[in-house]
Amino acid sequence: MHTKLKNGACFVTEAEKKELKSSTMKRVMIWLIATFVCSASVCNAQQGDESAMGYPQAEWLRAGDILMHTPGQELFNGVIHPAAGLFEDYFDVDKAAEEHRGYIEMLQKNGIRVHTVRDILDEVGIDSLRVLADNELIYDISGIPDVDADESEAYRQEVLQKMSRGDLIRCILLQPTVKLSKTDNNTGYEAQYIQNPLMNLYFTRDQSITTPRGHVICNMNSSQRAPETSIISLCYEHLGLKPILRIEGDGRLEGGDYIPAGTVSLIGCGMRTNDEGIRQLMEADAFGHDTVVVVRDHKLWQMQMHLDTYFNIIDRNLCTMVSSRLNAQLGEPEFNTCDIWARKPGTKEYALWKQDQPFVEYIRSRGFEIIPIDYDDEMHYANNFLTIAPRHIMAVGGQSEELQRRFADAGVTVEWVPLESLIDGYGAAHCMTQVLQRETTGDTVSAIVSTANDANVTDTKAYSLDGRRLQGKPSCADVYIDNGIKVVNK
């Protein structure tokens, strides 16, 4: 007998369920002991409580699945006025796409399964695409009040029903508005065509976060980026992942401000994430850690808009920080403070334990060695690297010899990624990735599955979402991990 687990993503036998339950209970007991010691006090041990589900307990664990988006036509409108597009400078759209594809290839060579937004949009049901496109295609008839609104809407729906998959995707990414006016010539209509394309979608770090408990859909600080979350939500649905929370109302949350760190969650509060967003996360028990450290940014500078632009983690006892923050003195805008929230093991409600603590001191008290990132390297996005395994990072190429030496002295393997065009969008290797799962202990494989129509399973090396080897072939079409690689069954 095969039973579908609650997450809807994997199938295991009854015997496997009993084995999994037993091992899970052991992990829970270990977690309770570790959390009791660490969550309400500063812990130097840096235990990495690693979830059986593969959700990242810590930034330094081996990456298994990553969601990315290779930019396309939607990028052009952003580069013709970079500031309005939330970009730093003009950059070549075609070169940027080429760089992004190269980055994906480098990740895949490390055994990472990369899921792209465009591939997912090419796979989902066309009705799902039509729902998204319906929200984005606008007929503006305000300039012709004598036109019947119901007739105009019926015409719009008729066009949407006829649209091909490719054109529905263009509607979703370009967000077109047709501003209509009347004329006596030709068809009787003229139009001004306006686009509000999702030029920042390639920064897939920001629309969601992945905590030890699961996935959270963010509420973006910039209104022009708000529609991106609907696309990412659809991607999660297609991958068989159900987000546990969506930030709403006045709450603001962007993924670049969140870093899981073993027994604690680090969350930045500043330009893009606010206290209300953090409150919603804690109230919903979405962090999955008994200690939450709110890192307060007092500088509010675009170049350091998120926590991951000035602080990052390489291993359980090694991190980086830009020199201006590392060396800042109390009272200077670069000086980060942090508030530490904690709760008793087994309880839900957090309480403020310590407030306005020096962030650098806190990090060092937890046993981290800090590699400084000097100004010139910071301006080249050196701190915005992606950790794909302990002391193994993907970082923007072209950094100083001094920084290269610092990494080498710390035993860090660095793969230098050519991202010269893409970084002019105000982000780099970390910003362009959303790590959906990181491997658990041992040699298990964590893999995201894709919802599919019918199965064609030819390999017995199949794994469930929690990384457990399945005996024989999966019995259903919506779970299929072939030798650790996602297979899309059409």
Question: What is each PLM-predicted segment?
Answer:
Residues 479-490:
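C-terminal tail/sorting-segment detector
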Residues 41-45:
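Sec/Tat signal peptide C-region and signal peptidase I cleavage site
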Residues 5, 18-31:
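Bacterial N-terminal signal peptides that target proteins for export
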Residues 31-40:
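Bacterial N-terminal signal peptides
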Residues 46-442:
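The feature marks the mature, well-folded catalytic cores of soluble enzymes
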Residues 443-466:
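Residue-level detector of functionally pivotal "anchor" positions at catalytic/ligand-binding pockets or at interdomain
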